[in-house]
Amino acid sequence: IKGELAASRPWSAWVAEHLRSVDAGRPVEPPADDRRAVAAQATFGFTRELLTTVLRPMATAGKEPTASMGDDTPPAVLGLTARPVGHFLRQRFAQVTNPPIDHLRERHVLSSRTLLGCRHPLLSEEPEAAGMLELDGFTLTPDGLEALKDPALGLCPKVLDATWPVDDGPGGLRAACVRLGEEAVAAVRDGACLLVISDAAADERSEAVPVPSLLAVGATQQRLLREGLATRTSVVADTGEPVDSHQAAALLGYGADAICPRLTLAAAATLDQDPAAAQDRYRDALTEGVFKVMSKMGISVLDAYRGAQIFEAVGLDGEVVDLCFAGTPSPLGGIGLDELAADALDRHRAGQAEVARLENPGWFKHRPGGEYHATNPEVMQALHFTVREGAEMKGSKRGAHLLQQAVKGGGFERYKHYASLVNERPPAALRDLLATSPAGPPVPLDEVEPAADIMARFSTAAMSLGSLSPEAHETLAIALNRVGGRSNCGEGGEDPARFGTERSSAIKQVASGRFGVTPAYLANAVELQIKIAQGSKPGEGGQLPGHKVSAEIARLRHTQPGVALISPPPHHDIYSIEDLAQLVFDLKQANPTAEVSVKLVAEAGVGTVAAGVVKSLADVVMISGADGGTGASPLSSIKHGGAPWELGLAETQQALVANNLRSRCKVRVDGGFKTGRDVLVAALLGADEFGFGTAALLAEGCLMVRTCHQDNCP
């Protein structure tokens, strides 16, 4: 049959005759007028730290920036500073039910090939069906975009103005989104095979306010889909807004076929003596970043990712979702078009100021007057002060002795001060919006669960010996063993000399690389944890650079010093719930007395996965929040991957109850826990056990410099 079909038409001749390759265009020249460039950047929401923290490494090193210690800023809807629309969309990822792809080691299966033009029906057997333009990637320069308007190419392009008059006020945004959809439908019906959604008018006309590019592309795509016209044209986003891979991935995911990030290319051109090389490196970094986002869902071809809408909205109301992101999970509601328009108007005013300047809002690192950070210097100092009470004692007393001295010396009063800083902060997490109400009169203290039983519900988050020093790693194990909780050794094994002592971690983790997993390791665990995903980079693997692989780490991981160690994104023996059940069974054979837990990360649909985990006979389902800490992760993953644990925990609880599975497991949660109130809210949402990561590190003296990934912590 295959041979008959191959010979039925001159397919290769049709492709050779009709499919034409085009390039991305000539590089952009550095801006001649710096003041005008800054004004344009301010109009589109650029910040100083966006240029230095995100764009500079992309343009100079050709790769996305790496960061550490997780995201402790509020969700975009709760932020003190205005955020781009893309910050309201969280990246989704595969866990258990299908495998993510390793975008670094499996690059040969990835493709950013882009086709522009009208797509004929899938089973069309006509030469014209091959009449499209082919790009190697999804980025265009202004020169390349202009070349697509050549009538000889036959695309009949139509430019749609993605701006609105400033005099129309906030209501102008809604009207502009509706207008874009109507103009797109009319243009496609008139034969336009290329739609250019452009906010370039904002560069030329002071009264033009740019429509946020995601809203412009999303509104256009949704209208085309409703009219059945989406495959009859291609969409190019000509915009000054996107800088990082998350914004680019969102534009592609909501319907853009190609992107012309003209303002970012111009900014990149100023970061190197060779402007063309800087732009090439930026485009390479952007492509790698989009590959990473695609790979999280196991998607290898960009054509399969376009328009797939693999995001969830956190903080957008129903009108915005219905108009621009229809079908996207949005469990919370939030701000609407009027609020987003007000932010756009504020940016426009900043760009029109007599002397425009870029702000430094502190999205990535804490700065006075900037975005709120949950782990800010005041909170850190209060916590350090609390746990160090009694540290001036003479002699070598430590551990429990210092704890006793702290309590006797008023340590609890100091804790209450620390807790008040956290509990009375501006809303920085979804749980801060929840108020507890008494269920009845107070219960006598002697009827409350004993402190020892409560402590047994606490654990530390998984932190490996590769991310912590041996001293810090052992301190956590000793502390949790003494108070009756469980420490988690993370992936990478543990020194056998610690087994059977108070230095032994109760929870031994089994990750995708299986580093350090030996029969003795498994046998010396109270709990064995299968790590499916990590809150700071869900859907991604891990890599320990060779210079960090010391002789000690190499010994524990059964490898060679100086050789980089790779944990792939998926467990290559877990591509389904049935595969997970097999690993759970195997671990219980290795250690019949140990509980087996499975670590997931919050996202829409995690409840269904959790139900499968329980059916695989795991004893504990663990839900990690997106704000979890890390020793090193891509910055875009830290800021935009996964969802808050409050959403994941609530969905998991409801799914397990609905399927009569809740009594068969314990549910544990972690991600940014700092005080007893966090524990209380999590318990009310369904959790049995609670994990502390960053707070535990701070308690033992971490200074939160956020340079773990650079291996130069002071």
Task: Give the role of each language-model region.
Residues 171-176, 430-437, 536-542, 563, ...:
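Short, mixed-charge, low-aromatic patches
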Residues 156-302, 312, 317, 323, ...:
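Glycine-rich phosphate/ribose-binding loops and adjacent secondary-structure elements
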